[in-house]
Regions:
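Phosphate/dinucleotide-binding and metal-coordinating scaffold of catalytic cores
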Residues: 1-316, 320-418
Length: 418
């Protein structure tokens, strides 16, 4: 009997737009992944290509070997933090079973995610069954467990852990709520008192600054600047540093929203050399009808804000889109942080320049369908919101030395005001 690693999975679309529907089959056989649409899906009026590399054709599709899977399924899989949890669990299980640890690949990470917290609206189950993969009850524990989750995540963020009994206990607590999430920092899903799904982003053992508090500060500035961001909160639990909590935007009143990263929809393998103008072009070509113009202005506002606050780790997986009734909509902003370790943005501001400059942002106004006057107004609104960044940092309890250390991230804002 073959393991889950070598069985075909039914791929279901369960979004807020229509009843759940089987859309295809994703198979893994001897290291090779293939996908094929269900013929009933191909015949439906609402059918759409899940991924730019998966056209609506009745044929098998194979991903690029270097990726190991299609972008839309990679978006449903964990990034570095979730992968770290899974790798540590596999190493511990291998030790307990007196065997060599398996090397985990893209397929393993996909099937290792809990269904309840999986990003987006795709769900997976073994063919012939009616239970979706990953149905543990504690995939998103209640907010009352947040203190325990933070404490465990702090321990698991260590590069080396020698106490295997402690590791076993910690993984039992955190793998289910934490393994679905992207990014490199420790985090976990949890359920708020009103039933909404949230993410807690925790301090790491090697932190030398209050990363969570800074994300909260920038979140508040973003709200003032007219940036679309989900609700958020800041708590201090076991640590000198804070935990930043933010509501999941891919859930609406309990329903799932179909989400894809900019990396996937732009058919990219990496972000270097890419530009914000490519995101604008995607919205012009594939945006959701009546709101496409507003989304383009929101994207321009977001570029200006990222430059003003030094959010320079702005790679294509940190931008995304959710599917609307008539096309793609710009997803709310997420993972926006002042970055003191990068002098330039990952994405180019115009077609070639990734240096942080609000003047460069202004020069791109026409690509977003904005007049020069409207663009100047938007940038001024953003700059006015960011003017208070020092006061906001102090109110969040960030130490004065940390404020001065982070000032370089706001250099483009300072230059604009000079």
């Amino acid at each position: 009997m073959r393991s889950n690693q070598d069985k075909a999975l039914e791929v279901w679309l369960d979004s807020d737009l229509a009843p759940a529907c089987l859309v295809g089959t994703l198979a893994h056989d001897r290291g090779q992944v293939r996908f094929r649409y269900d013929r009933n899906w191909l015949g439906q009026a609402r059918a759409f290509a899940l991924d730019p590399d998966l056209s609506l054709d009745d044929q098998p599709f194979f991903p690029k070997p270097e990726l190991g899977n299609f972008g839309v399924f990679l978006d449903s899989s964990p990034d570095r933090w979730g992968q770290t949890l899974m790798k540590r669990r596999e190493a511990l299980q291998a030790k307990d079973e007196k065997r060599t640890p398996r090397t985990l690949y893209a397929w393993d990470f996909l099937i290792g995610v809990q269904d309840f917290t999986r990003q987006g609206a795709l769900r997976f189950r073994l063919a012939g069954t009616d239970v979706f993969l990953g149905n543990e009850k504690m995939a998103a524990p209640p907010v009352t467990t947040l203190r325990e989750l933070e404490a465990v995540a702090f321990q698991l963020s260590s590069r080396r852990i020698d106490d295997l009994d402690a590791l076993r206990k910690w993984l039992t607590v955190l793998v289910a709520p934490g393994a679905s999430l992207g990014g490199a920092r420790p985090k976990a899903n949890f359920t708020e008192a009103d039933g909404t799904l949230w993410i807690g982003k925790f301090p790491a053992r090697d932190d030398d600054r209050d990363v969570g508090a800074w994300e909260y500060v920038v979140h508040g500035l973003a709200t003032k600047a007219g940036i679309d961001v989900p609700p958020a909160s800041l708590v201090r639990l076991n640590n000198d540093f804070h935990t930043f909590c933010i509501q999941r935007f891919d859930r609406v009143k309990g329903a799932r929203r179909f989400y894809a990263s900019a990396m996937t929809l732009l058919r990219k393998e990496h972000s270097e050399g890419s530009s914000y103008l490519e995101l604008a072009q995607f919205l012009r070509s594939n945006g959701d009808g009546a709101r496409a113009g507003a989304d383009l202005e929101q994207l321009f506002r977001r570029v200006a804000f990222n430059v003003a606050v030094g959010n320079r780790d702005d790679h294509l997986r940190n931008h995304g889109f959710v599917l609307g009734t008539n096309g793609w909509q710009l997803a709310p902003a997420f993972d926006v942080n002042p970055n003191i370790d990068k002098a330039e943005h990952v994405l180019n501001i115009d077609d070639a320049d990734n240096r942080p400059s609000l003047q460069t942002v202004l020069s791109t106004a026409a690509f977003y369908g904005l007049t020069a006057d409207r663009a100047a107004q938007v940038v001024e609104e953003v700059a006015s919101a960011v003017d208070s960044w020092r006061d906001a940092a102090r109110k969040a309890g960030i130490a004065a030395a940390d404020v001065e250390l982070t000032a370089g991230a706001f250099s483009a804002h300072s230059e604009y005001r000079a």
